[in-house]
């Protein structure tokens, strides 16, 4: 065996090669810390593997913010997330990093973000119309094309990491904790993304992946939305996950993919993969979801959910698909919020409309000796995991 065949991204291949080193060399990044006394925690929104997330108030201007208190991880990982958020700040539909502070007692870093009035996706997705799905998918694509054009892969695209304020039709791509800079020829860790959204490249341990990983994850989101099946590929572990995919896309194309890149398949797959034909997307349509499905939706989905990462649409190509013609037409007519890339302006006045008069929450006071770092549970009550708790 001569090892796997190398692969390079079809687009934005050399973005980081042409940037100064300080753009992507996050280990050398010097973090500028803000003042933690400016923030007062209000309530816990949820917890993720790497963080706890709180709603808070910036007491200098009474604006709502979200504070993500990072659990102890390698400094390198924290610096990577900060550098990526700073590089992407102001991009279309990218969550805005407002400040970085440190608790004086525990020395725990905390990231302060713009506040998004999110609706839990499990509730929201059940109510979305065909047009809504097209609209929000297009908004995610703006964020993905932007971060890819900036030489960055998100690597954790999933509903929990897409905040939607449905009332204002505002979307933000959050949780850049697994994001990484793309360097052609580099081999990356395959232990990224969440199981149901992991691309085949991760499941077969192919490390020279690229931005196209995010496009697979987006395809999984689209399938779950139009077919009303959450998640669409429901594996019980990482091995079963590939089996679930193979039962839909077929084993023949999987073996073609493995052969093309000279991938050595884990012997554990021998007993569980079996032989499966490729299924037509139409077989997932039924009376409850048919109003969300159209020929162009299925064509678009088919061009995302491909084993071969090089065969998937890029974010920019996806935005030009007929599935989005009505959305593009409407945004052009509305002048696209007068912003490049059609994003909602990220001025604090616009972000915080209607909440600038929120009174400072006096009952809580500074928590656990610090306005940022809370006691175990500041509200003294069970906190359900919020959508986006993985942030």
Curated annotation (Swiss-Prot):
Modified residues (Phosphoserine): 362, 370
Binding site for ATP: 45-53, 68
Record keywords: Apoptosis, ATP-binding, Biological rhythms, Cell cycle, Disease variant, Intellectual disability, Kinase, Nucleotide-binding, Nucleus, Phosphoprotein, Serine/threonine-protein kinase, Transcription, Transcription regulation, Transferase, Wnt signaling pathway
PROSITE patterns: PROTEIN_KINASE_ATP, PROTEIN_KINASE_DOM, PROTEIN_KINASE_ST
Record's keyword annotation contains Cell cycle: yes
Gene3D superfamilies: Phosphorylase Kinase, domain 1 (3.30.200.20), Transferase(Phosphotransferase) domain 1 (1.10.510.10)
Post-translational modification remark: Phosphorylated at Thr-344, Thr-360, Ser-362 and Ser-370 by CDK1 in prophase and metaphase and dephosphorylated during anaphase. Phosphorylation does not directly affect casein kinase 2 activity, but may contribute to its regulation by forming binding sites for interacting proteins and/or targeting it to different compartments.
Active-site annotation: 156 (proton acceptor)
Catalysis: reaction(s): L-seryl-[protein] + ATP = O-phospho-L-seryl-[protein] + ADP + H(+); L-threonyl-[protein] + ATP = O-phospho-L-threonyl-[protein] + ADP + H(+)
One GO BP: positive regulation of protein catabolic process
Modified residues (Phosphothreonine): 344, 360
Disorder: Okur-Chung neurodevelopmental syndrome: An autosomal dominant neurodevelopmental disorder characterized by developmental delay, intellectual disability, behavioral problems, hypotonia, speech problems, microcephaly, pachygyria and variable dysmorphic features.
Family to which this protein belongs: Belongs to the protein kinase superfamily. Ser/Thr protein kinase family. CK2 subfamily.
Subunit and interaction comment: Heterotetramer composed of two catalytic subunits (alpha chain and/or alpha' chain) and two regulatory subunits (beta chains). The tetramer can exist as a combination of 2 alpha/2 beta, 2 alpha'/2 beta or 1 alpha/1 alpha'/2 beta subunits. Also part of a CK2-SPT16-SSRP1 complex composed of SSRP1, SUPT16H, CSNK2A1, CSNK2A2 and CSNK2B, which forms following UV irradiation. Interacts with RNPS1. Interacts with SNAI1. Interacts with PML (isoform PML-12). Interacts with CCAR2. Interacts with HIRIP3.
Protein name as catalogued: Casein kinase II subunit alpha
């Amino acid at each position: 065996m001569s090892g796997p065949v190398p692969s390079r991204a079809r687009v934005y291949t050399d973005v980081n090669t042409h940037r100064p080193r300080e753009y992507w060399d996050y280990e050398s990044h010097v973090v500028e810390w803000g003042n933690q006394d400016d923030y007062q925690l209000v309530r816990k929104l949820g917890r993720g593997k790497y963080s706890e997330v709180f709603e808070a108030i910036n007491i200098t201007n009474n604006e709502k913010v979200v504070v993500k208190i990072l659990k102890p991880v390698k400094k390198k990982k924290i610096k990577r997330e900060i550098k990526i958020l700073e590089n992407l700040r102001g991009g279309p539909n990218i969550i805005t990093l407002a400040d970085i502070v440190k608790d004086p007692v525990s020395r725990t870093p905390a990231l302060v973000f713009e506040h998004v009035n999110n609706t839990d996706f499990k509730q929201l997705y059940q109510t979305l119309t065909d047009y809504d799905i097209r609209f929000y998918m297009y908004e995610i694509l703006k964020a993905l094309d932007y971060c890819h054009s900036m030489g960055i892969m998100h690597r954790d695209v999933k509903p929990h990491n897409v905040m939607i304020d449905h009332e204002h039709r505002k979307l933000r791509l959050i949780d850049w904790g697994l994001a990484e800079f793309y360097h052609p020829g580099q081999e990356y860790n395959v232990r990224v993304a969440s199981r149901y959204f992991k691309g085949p490249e991760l499941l077969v341990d192919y490390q020279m992946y690229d931005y196209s990983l995010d496009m697979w994850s987006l395809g999984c989101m689209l399938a779950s939305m139009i077919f009303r099946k959450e998640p669409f590929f429901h594996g019980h572990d990482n091995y079963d996950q590939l089996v679930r995919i193979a039962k839909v896309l077929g084993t023949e194309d999987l073996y073609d993919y493995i052969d093309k890149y000279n991938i050595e398949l884990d012997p554990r797959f021998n007993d569980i993969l079996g032989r499966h034909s490729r299924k037509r997307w139409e077989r997932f349509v039924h009376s409850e979801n048919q109003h969300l499905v159209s020929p162009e939706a299925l064509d678009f989905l088919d061009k995302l959910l491909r084993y071969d990462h090089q065969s998937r649409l890029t974010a920019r190509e996806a935005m030009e698909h007929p599935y989005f013609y009505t959305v593009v037409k409407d945004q052009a007519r509305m002048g696209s919020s007068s912003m490049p890339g059609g994003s909602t302006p990220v001025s604090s006045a616009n972000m915080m409309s209607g909440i600038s008069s929120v009174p400072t929450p006096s009952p809580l006071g500074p928590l656990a000796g610090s306005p940022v770092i809370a006691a175990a549970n500041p509200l003294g009550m069970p906190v359900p995991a919020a959508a986006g708790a993985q942030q």
